[in-house]
């Protein structure tokens, strides 16, 4: 039977899923540990000093580290800001 008042959408089906992304910093031979850690501290919200240093060490040891994950728009902003400070960045990875 047709509902003349309109169709009610199922909220579970109608919610748009916003794309998420990962921000990854790559190791390089020219940025110092201090510079990388400072960039992470000043650009990534809620980044603690300990976490910034842990990520910096991981970048050095493994070649890269995911420094932030979340909605694509924010990921693009953090990626651009870190890149503008001279960090070597992997392309944004959509998840």
Functional labels for PLM-detected ranges:
Residues 1-95:
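Terminal domain-initiation and capping elements
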């Amino acid at each position: 039977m047709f509902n003349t008042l309109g169709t009610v959408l199922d909220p579970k089906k109608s919610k748009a899923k916003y794309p998420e992304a990962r921000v990854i910093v790559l190791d390089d031979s020219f940025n110092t540990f201090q510079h990388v850690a400072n960039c992470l501290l000043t650009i990534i919200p809620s980044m603690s000093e300990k976490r910034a240093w842990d990520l910096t060490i991981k970048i050095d040891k493994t070649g890269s580290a995911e420094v932030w994950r979340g909605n694509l728009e924010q990921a693009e902003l953090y990626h651009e800001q870190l890149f503008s400070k001279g960090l070597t960045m992997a392309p944004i990875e959509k998840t």
